Amino acid sequence: MSRAGDTAIAAEVQHRRRVIVDVILLLMRNGRILLRERANTGFGDGAYEPPTGQLADRETIVETAIRVASAEAGVAIQAGNVSLAHVMQDVSGSGRIAFFLTVSGWQGEYTSPDARWFGVGNLPTNMLDRSRVALRNYAEGMRFSTYPAFGPAGPALLRASGWQDAFSA
């Protein structure tokens, strides 16, 4: 191959991005959602978020959901009970895409001291912002969004517009 061809391939490879896929379960019942307090993760420790895990190699998103439900929430779910609620692309440079999934039924009951049920209209103030935004977007019927909203300038644009978060405590 010519040197020019090698350069073109190298340039193309440089622009490829490795994507981290997060799978986030929205376990809801009677207007409440199960949230876990993060601990020992190195990011957002002490903040609440729904049960979350990363897509593993050779695993489907639904298989990840089943694994996360068991490992993070202590419940068993069936593939047929999992539905797509929202997809969020992080445009801050982290290379993350999050699939927020609703689960229509499960077996078992989560009893860990780091988890609590919260009313969707009364979420904790110390909740990870991306989850709060995704829940708001899902409630408004949006199925896809970027985070931060509108890219890195999003929070300032939202404040300037007088935006109010429907899920704020």
Put a short name on every predicted segment.
Residues 1-24:
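Acidic, metal-coordinating catalytic segment for phosphate/diphosphate chemistry
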Residues 20-24, 96-100, 132:
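Short hydrophobic/aromatic beta-strand or adjacent loop that forms the aromatic wall/cage
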Residues 29:
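A cytosolic small-molecule/anion-sensing beta-strand core signal
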Residues 32-71:
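Conserved Nudix-box catalytic region and its N-terminal flanking loop in Nudix hydrolases
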Residues 35, 100-102, 115-117:
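Conserved hydrophobic/aromatic beta-strand scaffold that supports enzyme active sites
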Residues 45, 113-169:
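Nudix hydrolase/Nudix homology domain
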